[in-house]
Amino acid sequence: MVGQMKSFLFLFVFLVLTKTVISARKPSKSQPKPCKNFVLYYHDIMFGVDDVQNATSAAVTNPPGLGNFKFGKLVIFDDPMTIDKNFQSEPVARAQGFYFYDMKNDYNAWFAYTLVFNSTQHKGTLNIMGADLMMVQSRDLSVVGGTGDFFMSRGIVTFETDTFEGAKYFRVKMDIKLYECY
């Protein structure tokens, strides 16, 4: 009988300790799924190059000459956003804001802008800001708010440079994932 009690006690303690160790492990967090997800293309034509009439952005300050990476240059833009890569497609929104080059030893810009939607599909705005590490293939900026169809939205915009034609034109694929939708 004493042998059975010892075996039972040992088994009981073993099970309690095993349960404690298992429950002490942190559960793995699964990635939340976006409540809205869509892709847009950002088209930028710089002022002062070949296509002045169709320019959608202009430098309002020039770099002061501190390096070879445009450090200090400030650009204001009002760029069309399309659902495909074609610049001639009907814009579904306008990206209105600015970016400035903020790194002396590599290309890097800091963006702050509003996507202004006025289409049959969406009405309202999304506010986006953050660092664009241009030399990285895929980079994320923050969606920090919105209005209308995007009231108080938050999320991530993943940038991928799709086309780059020097100081003339560039196109960025923007994968917009909203995680807070009201």
UniProtKB/Swiss-Prot annotation:
InterPro entries: Allene_oxi_cyc_Dirigent, Dirigent. One of its GO terms (molecular function) is guiding stereospecific synthesis activity. Residues 1-23 form the signal peptide. Gene3D superfamilies: Allene oxide cyclase-like (2.40.480.10). Glycans are attached at N54, N118. The keyword Cytoplasm does not apply. It comes from the Eukaryota. Its main location: secreted. Disulfide bonds join C35-C181. Belongs to the plant dirigent protein family. Dirigent proteins impart stereoselectivity on the phenoxy radical-coupling reaction, yielding optically active lignans from two molecules of coniferyl alcohol in the biosynthesis of lignans, flavonolignans, and alkaloids and thus plays a central role in plant secondary metabolism. Enantiocomplementary dirigent protein that mediates the laccase-catalyzed enantioselective oxidative phenol coupling of (E)-coniferyl alcohol to (-)-pinoresinol. Homodimer. PANTHER family: DIRIGENT PROTEIN (PTHR46442), DIRIGENT PROTEIN 5 (PTHR46442:SF6). This is Dirigent protein 5. The gene is DIR5.
